[in-house]
Amino acid sequence: MEFSSRAAELTTLLESRMTNFYTNFQVDEIGRVVSVGDGIARVYGLNEIQAGEMVEFASGVKGIALNLENENVGIVVFGSDTAIKEGDLVKRTGSIVDVPAGKAMLGRVVDALGVPIDGRGALSDHERRRVEVKAPGIIERKSVHEPMQTGLKAVDSLVPIGRGQRELIIGDRQTGKTAIAIDTILNQKQMNSRATSESETLYCVYVAIGQKRSTVAQLVQILSEANALEYSILVAATASDPAPLQFLAPYSGCAMGEYFRDNGMHALIIYDDLSKQAVAYRQMSLLLRRPPGREAFPGDVFYLHSRLLERAAKRSDQTGAGSLTALPVIETQAGDVSAYIPTNVISITDGQICLETELFYRGIRPAINVGLSVSRVGSAAQLKAMKQACGSLKLELAQYREVAAFAQFGSDLDAATQALLNRGARLTEVLKQPQYAPLPIEKQILVIYAAVNGFCDRMPLDKIPQYERDILTTIKPELLQSLKGGLTSERKIELEKFLKEKAKNYTL
């Protein structure tokens, strides 16, 4: 009896020990580094790994599995590969790449993995979102119908942008592409201060890809001085960061913007610029020995950008009515918009703002080529009052460009042609705008209405900026605010009387 009771005790003890043993038991799938170099590691042994899964090297550096082959796995390293040696252990994390998202991110500067780099400590309350997700389906979307104002007269009047649109900013280096993007962020300050509900507020995400660190620091300073950092998130993968981080940064920024889109809020995301992301992806693909195609880019470089930009959308009322607006930037070489990456992104987006070096050096800033710039869906989102004010603006500018080319030959011009040249020069002058000085929409309507209706026709060109400042500062505030509601016949009479009176002081 004594023996059997002791046996029972022993059995119970063994069972409890074994139960506790298995609760602390963890299985990790590991592999070994076969070769490493140029930020690419070939790893043998990770047979169950998923595409896009994060792995961790023995040195603590992380990487992402991009090539799944029979013999080994091609892993791109997020960081320096100098500490990784042949034969090192590599551990699966079991998770696809994800980043932090939420309102806790506002006002912060983070890297492509969402790690803060602004020296202000760890992130507070946030959720995590996968960087690669499917874009919203057709049924979940709604057509673009709400305006997303940039504060730039040339853009809001001629190439209007709506919430949920993708509008490309394209041009050579040093033509003011980033300036348009920054002005758009700064313009949201006054828009957000007037917002009465969450659905009117627009949050901004700026993704810097392959830029100098000094440029990013300068941008942070500009935004903080204008108090625009409080509604903005900056994602920076600078020129000194490895190519995999430059490739990943736009997707990380997009995941952060999608938090607002999917929670019934509105966000704007700027990718500055996608040319550098394509170059980083080409570098990675060639090192992974993927077959090169046109301009040595891999065959799926179109999909690289299309799957990113399709995530910008206006959601239907049933799915929260949120939106994500995208302003991708592409840098051209010597104005060649027919190169591989520019044509790809032009075909994906809903329109483009084309900037030209020649216009920039002639002092026309923003240097927008009105003939080549187009917004395919934005006119549905443009305010009725702005449509009324613009009237024949685009047509007159097109006729002016056509006639100006012939006028250079110095032949005698008839009165109608002379009037057309005169009007075109003044319209061009009115559309000029200094950097970091976005205008509210009602002020834009006032200035454009004055120019289109001929109140500037008899003024010297150098007097127009002065006239513009004068009418903006002396107009009755109630008349100015009423312009947003549309130009009724009574308002037109009052407005024209005011503009005519002011124009007398500046005419020849």
Swiss-Prot record:
GO cellular component: mitochondrial inner membrane; proton-transporting ATP synthase complex
Keywords: ATP synthesis, ATP-binding, CF(1), Hydrogen ion transport, Ion transport, Membrane, Mitochondrion, Mitochondrion inner membrane, Nucleotide-binding, Transport
InterPro entries in alphabetical order: ATP_synth_asu-like_sf (IPR023366), ATP_synth_asu_C (IPR000793), ATP_synth_asu_C_sf (IPR038376), ATP_synth_F1_a_nt-bd_dom (IPR033732), ATP_synth_F1_asu (IPR005294), ATPase_a/bsu_AS (IPR020003), ATPase_F1/V1/A1_a/bsu_N (IPR004100), ATPase_F1/V1/A1_a/bsu_N_sf (IPR036121)
Protein family: Belongs to the ATPase alpha/beta chains family.
Transmembrane regions listed in the UniProt entry: none
Native species: Phaseolus vulgaris (Kidney bean)
Stated name of the protein: ATP synthase subunit alpha, mitochondrial
Residue numbers marked as site, Required for activity: S373
